[in-house]
Amino acid sequence: MAENVLSAQKRTEQGKGPARRLRQQGLIPAVVYGGKREPTHVALDPATLLKAIETPHKFNTLLELQVDGASKHVLFKDYTVDPVTRKLLHADFLEVSLDQPVRVEVPVATVGRAAGVAEGGILSVATHEVVVEALPNKIPVRIEVDVTELKIGRSLHVSELKPPEGCKFKFQTDYVVVFVAVPEKEEVAAPVAAAVPGAAPAEGAAPAAGAAAPAGGAAPAAGAAPAKGGEAKGGDKAKK
């Protein structure tokens, strides 16, 4: 991994006020963590930093940070941007030693076309980053996972992956990295028979809107006398 050189100056003032003044001067505050010393507070040019990390490693980019004549090796770890302007406001670095391994997260990239995809399956990446232990200058850009032989319903765990030379995968649980899912079957609704014009409704079914009521038990016409033996609504019983 090639190193990019980044210049910075040490700062003694912290807080919102000094940070605001730095930004007015075209600089941003940054902090260097790690090592056996207290965190180092520095100021640097954001444009220079953005150019320095324009590498495939991005957050795992190894930098040589020069602060007031002294240099140290660092990894770019985190940053803050303005939510409106998207300008860089703050940066964090991790100080490292070139002869001491570090643990970092490295992105996963699949290689090839899974056999299960040809069978109608769906390739899914369950874990997009894996934890790798390596020397700072041996950190891989990505972890390539060959899925060519992966059949439908099968998966690859992190323990089954081959780490790049000089790297180790670190994990407590043997988690799934990629798998080929079985496609879900779509349920087909049963066809509904079309109504035949003029057909009688099924037994117990209500008549269609606007249809005549059945003859049996039909209501009497307006003003007609009730059926024999019946009662007149709202009146006395019929005379015998």
UniProtKB/Swiss-Prot annotation:
UniProt cross-references to InterPro entries, sorted A to Z: Rbsml_bL25/Gln-tRNA_synth_N, Ribosomal_bL25/Gln-tRNA_synth, Ribosomal_bL25_b-dom, Ribosomal_bL25_C, Ribosomal_bL25_long, Ribosomal_L25_dom, Ribosomal_uL5_bac-type
Query: Is-annotated flag, keyword Phosphoprotein?
Result: no
**Keyword tags:** Ribonucleoprotein, Ribosomal protein, RNA-binding, rRNA-binding
Q: Name one GO cellular component term.
A: cytosolic large ribosomal subunit
Q: Where is the composition biased (Basic and acidic residues)?
A: 230-240
Cite the residue spans of the region called Disordered.
1-20, 204-240
MF GO annotations: 5S rRNA binding; structural constituent of ribosome
Top-rank taxon of the source lineage equals: Bacteria
From its record, what is one biological process in GO terms? translation
Subunit (UniProt): Part of the 50S ribosomal subunit; part of the 5S rRNA/L5/L18/L25 subcomplex. Contacts the 5S rRNA. Binds to the 5S rRNA independently of L5 and L18.
PANTHER family attached to this UniProt entry: RIBOSOMAL PROTEIN L25/GLN-TRNA SYNTHETASE, ANTI-CODON-BINDING DOMAIN-CONTAINING PROTEIN, RIBOSOMAL PROTEIN L25_GLN-TRNA SYNTHETASE, ANTI-CODON-BINDING DOMAIN-CONTAINING PROTEIN
Function of the protein? This is one of the proteins that binds to the 5S RNA in the ribosome where it forms part of the central protuberance.
Family membership noted in the UniProt record = Belongs to the bacterial ribosomal protein bL25 family. CTC subfamily.
Name recorded for this polypeptide:
Large ribosomal subunit protein bL25
Origin species: Anaeromyxobacter sp. (strain K)
Q: What is the lineage of its organism?
A: Bacteria, Pseudomonadati, Myxococcota, Myxococcia, Myxococcales
